């Protein structure tokens, strides 16, 4: 929790410094490159603090099967910049890979070898909807002297069974990795038996392998990690997204705006045109000073997060900068409030500032990260990359 506290303190300090620098710029009329470097990081810090690990987790030293799987899933779902692909078939906004906690070998019976794998499930707080649950496992194991054919099934301690069904009749399908791996859907099992429980739960699966040749006993499992033979995938959709408000005005306000718009065109056209011309002449060209989108890129290494964020290596939030003139052009898509604020500034009280240049449209970013407990998480964060700007 120390790292999480430090991140929160850094976020607050950065926010205070950003506001102080902004105030100084407004008074002195000077630009600051350092300010531009700080400002785009604020949204990402706020979003990722929720997923930040407590104790310094590290990236896996070896490129294991679980990490390979998630990297392939990420490659198919997002491009190298972290932008979600339009044709992605993942069907969810978040995928968590859960590694097994236990690796208990059961006495073998004949040619059968059994392991009980336990997968921890977090409490269901209603923030995310479980879309799908699958287990990815190796259905062919090639050891030093043995070839094994394997499959998985639910394990119930009170009702053990002596029946070892063949893997030919299961509902598994090929996984994203090699042909030695399969993926089996267990959504119904997880939803019915585990998902409605509020506390911590353990999903136990029985990993069963049949020898293809006569061999010794359990020594064939030595050196085989449980994470190398199976892992759990949980697919979620976010259920607490903000509700978009309808864009309309009361009828009286619409009439007021139409009347004021007509007055502006007839009574103040000359004054406004002169002001726009003077403003354009004062600065080095309206194209360079009017509200517009500016590219900006920062690496997660610069933020000190590269030890737990796997992909993408860079974040391109972009930012909006420029002057919002008294005549708001149509391309800015300014809201009705900005038009009213402009009217107040012109006709009522000039102490009310004109609208500011801010992002208008955003696109999400897909992030692949390692959680504190060692799970690997793919998650799409909405509203992370500015795509266009507006005055409001």
UniProtKB/Swiss-Prot annotation:
Changing residue 5 to R: No or minor deleterious effect observed. It is found in: Secreted. Changing residue 148 to P: In POF4; leads to marked reduction of mature protein production; does not generate a complete recovery of wild-type activity in granulosa cell line transfected with defective mutant and with equal amount of wild-type protein. The modification Pyrrolidone carboxylic acid is found at residue 268. SMART domains: TGFB (SM00204). Keywords: Cytokine, Disease variant, Disulfide bond, Glycoprotein, Growth factor, Phosphoprotein, Premature ovarian failure, Pyrrolidone carboxylic acid, Secreted, Signal. Residues 19-267 form a propeptide. GO terms for cellular component: endoplasmic reticulum lumen; extracellular space. Glycans are attached at residues 87, 147, 237, 277, 373. The modification Phosphoserine is found at residue 273. Disulfide bonds join 291-357, 320-389, 324-391. GO terms for biological process: female gamete generation. GO terms for molecular function: cytokine activity; growth factor activity. Changing residue 138 to H: In POF4; leads to marked reduction of mature protein production; does not generate a complete recovery of wild-type activity in granulosa cell line transfected with defective mutant and with equal amount of wild-type protein. Changing residue 180 to T: In POF4; uncertain significance; no or minor deleterious effect detected. Residues 1-18 form the signal peptide. Belongs to the TGF-beta family. Homodimer. But, in contrast to other members of this family, cannot be disulfide-linked. May be involved in follicular development. Oocyte-specific growth/differentiation factor that stimulates folliculogenesis and granulosa cell (GC) growth. It is linked to Ovarian dysgenesis 2: A disorder characterized by lack of spontaneous pubertal development, primary amenorrhea, uterine hypoplasia, and hypergonadotropic hypogonadism as a result of streak gonads. Premature ovarian failure 4: An ovarian disorder defined as the cessation of ovarian function under the age of 40 years. It is characterized by oligomenorrhea or amenorrhea, in the presence of elevated levels of serum gonadotropins and low estradiol. This is Bone morphogenetic protein 15. The lineage of its organism: Eukaryota, Metazoa, Chordata, Craniata, Vertebrata.
